Structures are given as structure tokens and as C-alpha cells.
From Swiss-Prot:
Post-translational modification remark: Phosphorylated by SrrB.
GO MF annotation list: phosphorelay response regulator activity; transcription cis-regulatory region binding
GO biological process, one term: regulation of DNA-templated transcription
Protein name, per record: Transcriptional regulatory protein SrrA
Name of the gene encoding the protein in the UniProt record: srrA
Compartment list: Cytoplasm
Domain (Response regulatory) ranges: 4-117
InterPro entries given in the database record: CheY-like_superfamily (IPR011006), OmpR/PhoB-type_DNA-bd (IPR001867), Sig_transdc_resp-reg_receiver (IPR001789), WalR-like (IPR039420), WH-like_DNA-bd_sf (IPR036388)
SUPFAM superfamilies: CheY-like
Gene Ontology CC: cytosol; protein-DNA complex
Recorded superkingdom: Bacteria
Induction and repression of expression: Up-regulated during anaerobic growth.
Modified residues (4-aspartylphosphate): D53
Function: Member of the two-component regulatory system SrrA/SrrB, which is involved in the global regulation of staphylococcal virulence factors in response to environmental oxygen levels as well as biofilm formation. Also plays an essential role in host-derived nitric oxide resistance by regulating hmp/flavohemoglobin, an enzyme that detoxifies nitric oxide by converting it to nitrate. Functions as a transcription regulator by direct binding to promoter regions of target genes.
Length: 241
């Protein structure tokens, strides 16, 4: 696994600050000050993570993430001074895995990066070890964890890495209710710095993508009002034998 991180921000002060803190954790840092440069570097290199500012010259962060997701699944943490829900949703829609609003603590950014990489590395190790075929099957939904592929009514659904991890986590324990704090801790590995709206935004996007090809698959992700979410499996939706 690479220890190289790409920091993309048009403010030199922010790049220097993040570089200093991340280098203390033994990461190798690369920098870009505009969107076009960031996209070219990301395509040429296999970074462990990209810290991507939303407002950039030449090509903004949304455009960079959207174009990059057509070719790569490099983990992306979006950095922005805008905290409104619309901007957060746009960031996640473009393929970002996380979202941090400026002004932020550099230590928080380091913790977010480490949490994201722990999850990514854990998934890579699990997939590389010899094991029986890891597939979760329901009447309207199939999750092939070996191929990292989701089928809803036999049609492939293109999910971001974090949307996929969230779906897997819920589907592995059908009908169990998880509150938002649990999901932040287990899927995002946040205990102190997580924004609960991150969970809501990812669930919304996951449902929308599933619903495009199968309303039945989308309806399996249920909101438990005042608590959180569950992956609902009824008797006629039991995993295929």
C-alpha cells in the first residue's frame, strides 16, 4: 500500500500546514495548486489518499473527483470552506469518501486520513487472502465482495468505495438497527470528529443509485426514525441458497 498523499489546495499556507503534520506521520506528500494539475498527477500516480479542495482554479474539486472516478477509486477527502448541505452532497455525488469543512484542525485531518486508510487497507487484505467466494445474495440484490460488484435485479450499480462499504456493513447483519454513531465508528472509523449528516448523505445517495435500477433493492435500506438505519430482509427476500 502506498504511503503517498496528494494535497490539492490553491492556498500555499494550507498545503504547507497539512504537509508538515502528515510528514510527521511518515507520509510522503505531493502537492498541486489547481485542478488540472491535480487530475494529471492523480492519473499518473497511485496515491493512498487525495486531500482535495473544493474551490480550485482551472478545474474545481467536484470536476476533478468526477473525472477521476471514471478511471480510479483512489480515496478522496474533500476540503472546503462551504459547509452547506448542497455542497456536501455534490462532493459525495462526485465520489468523495469524506468531507472536512474549513477552518479545520490539522490533527483532525490526520485522524480522518488514517481512519480512511485503515478501512481501505483492511478491505485490500481481506480480498487478497484465499477464501470461499464472498457473495451476499438476496432476491433483488447481489453483493460480490470478491469482485467488488453490486447487482440490483441483475443490473450493475456503480458505487463509490464508501457507499459500497456502507452497503456491505448493513447487509451483513440483516434487520439489525444501527444508529448513526455506530455507522460512523464502524464504516468511517470516527469516534470524535464525525459529522452525523455524513451518514445521512451516503444513505440517500446509496438508495438513489439502487432505485435507478431496482426500487425493491432500494427499499431494503430502511430508516428507523429517531434511531438510524437497517437493512430490512423479509421472508420473500431471504438470501438465495
Amino acid at each position: 500500500m502506498s504511503n503517498e498523499i496528494l494535497i490539492v489546495d490553491d492556498e500555499d499556507r494550507i498545503r504547507r500546514l497539512l504537509k508538515m503534520y502528515l510528514e510527521r506521520e511518515s507520509f510522503e506528500i505531493h502537492e498541486a495548486s489547481n485542478g488540472q494539475e491535480a487530475y494529471e498527477l492523480a492519473m499518473e500516480n497511485n496515491y493512498a489518499c487525495i486531500l482535495l479542495d473544493l474551490m480550485l482554479p482551472e478545474m474545481d474539486g467536484i470536476q476533478v473527483a468526477t473525472k477521476l472516478r471514471e478511471h480510479k477509486q483512489t480515496p478522496i477527502i474533500m476540503l472546503t470552506a462551504k459547509g452547506e448541505e448542497t455542497n456536501r452532497v455534490e462532493g459525495f455525488e462526485s465520489g468523495a469518501d469524506d468531507y472536512i469543512v474549513k477552518p479545520f484542525s490539522p490533527r483532525e485531518v490526520v485522524l480522518r486520513v488514517k481512519a480512511l486508510l485503515r478501512r481501505t487497507q483492511s478491505t485490500t487484505v481481506e480480498q487478497s487472502e484465499p477464501h470461499a467466494r464472498d457473495v451476499i445474495e438476496f432476491k433483488h440484490l447481489e453483493i460480490d465482495n470478491d469482485a467488488h460488484r453490486v447487482l440490483a435485479d441483475n443490473q450493475e450499480v456503480n458505487l463509490t468505495p464508501k457507499e459500497y462499504e456502507l452497503l456491505i456493513y448493513l447487509a451483513k447483519t440483516p434487520n439489525k438497527v444501527f444508529d448513526r454513531e455506530q455507522l460512523l465508528k464502524e464504516v468511517w472509523h470516527y469516534e470524535f470528529y464525525g459529522d452525523l449528516r455524513t451518514v445521512d448523505t451516503h444513505v440517500k445517495r446509496l438508495r438513489e443509485k439502487l432505485n435507478r435500477v431496482s426500487s425493491e433493492a432500494a427499499h431494503m435500506i430502511q430508516t428507523v426514525w429517531g434511531v438510524g438505519y437497517k437493512f430490512e430482509v423479509k421472508s420473500n427476500d431471504e438470501p438465495a441458497k
